[in-house]
Regions:
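The two-metal-ion catalytic cores of nucleic-acid processing enzymes
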Residues: 1-210
Length: 210
């Protein structure tokens, strides 16, 4: 039997659709009836109901994806004790006095790559010389998707680096899709000091080091 913190019995109401939950919650609050956990996101509610706190096991039919090996639709999920070895990639850019992109660097364990607007070939193997900004973006995107990081990080990587890169991608009409789907990566810059800017990249986590 479910109980609240006062040890009083309570009922659990489940909805298949979020709009139905929102409507019922509003009507209950209008009647001045107390609710518990009604403000939780449906995704959080799903994790709690299935005792999922970290890793999950997925069981069900799947199909091949364009940028991922498997796409599951309505599978069975259950908690599992598993700690994955995540691929973490650090990103940093350097710009010139006129705001032009001079260098874009990537770094990870036993890996580094720098795309530079040098105009000539470098003797250093990790340096990729590009003729202009557009070529830096094209080669960076190709290398980035091939590396396929789980986590992207850097110092002020969202508010500065990715904000700059997003505008540059738009300038050269290159799709700003850096995730594991073809969906465009979504950047939201916050001017409020108490809110953090976010970058949503499908299938990846972006952690700002600032």
């Amino acid at each position: 039997t479910l109980k609240n913190f006062s040890k009083e019995p309570v009922s659990k109401v489940v909805f298949d659709l979020q709009p139905d939950l929102n409507k019922c919650r509003h009507e209950i609050h209008e009647s001045e009836i107390n609710t518990f956990e009604a403000d939780l996101k449906s995704s959080t509610r799903f994790l709690i109901d299935n005792d999922i706190y970290t890793s999950i096991e997925i069981d069900g039919d799947y199909e091949s994806g364009e940028l991922v090996e498997r796409i599951y639709r309505n599978p069975e999920v259950s908690p599992v004790a598993f700690r994955p070895k995540l691929k973490v990639l650090s990103l940093d850019i350097e710009t010139g006095e006129r705001g032009e992109l001079l260098c874009l660097g990537l770094y990870s364990d036993n890996y580094k790559k720098s795309f530079v607007s040098a105009g000539k070939t470098s003797k250093r193997k990790f340096v990729v010389s590009c003729k202009d900004e557009e070529e830096i973006l094209e080669k960076f995107k190709e290398e980035f998707l091939d590396f396929d990081p789980d986590v992207i990080t850097g110092w002020s990587v969202i508010d500065f680096d990715f904000a700059y890169l997003r505008d540059l991608f738009e300038k050269y009409k290159i799709n700003f899709s850096l995730g594991r789907t073809t969906e465009k990566s979504r950047l939201k810059i916050e001017s409020n000091f108490f809110r953090s800017s976010t970058l949503k990249v499908s299938g990846r986590l972006v952690l700002d080091g600032l």
